């Protein structure tokens, strides 16, 4: 099943450069896989939305939210 997403022109052109002969889905899966490995900043920097410091701050905030959510999850 395919989905339509809206992205900024600059992000689109970065994805086009990254994808080569691969599909957009393949590129995004790769980037998401890197995120799952603990490299959220790689995804943010790749799309040019954050510098490395901002990405690290966001990663820390996400970890804090995750801990908070886990504290509310019933066992």
Curated annotation (Swiss-Prot):
- Keyword Lyase applies: no
What InterPro entries does this protein's entry cite?
Put_antitoxin (IPR003847)
- Pfam families this protein is in? VAPB_antitox (PF02697)
The record's keywords, sorted A to Z, are: Toxin-antitoxin system
Q: Which family does it belong to?
A: Belongs to the UPF0330 family.
Q: Which NCBIfam families match?
A: PRK13696.1-2
General function of this protein:
Possibly the antitoxin component of a type II toxin-antitoxin (TA) system.
Q: What is this protein called?
A: Putative antitoxin PH1062.1
What organism does the UniProt record list as the source? Answer: Pyrococcus horikoshii (strain ATCC 700860 / DSM 12428 / JCM 9974 / NBRC 100139 / OT-3)
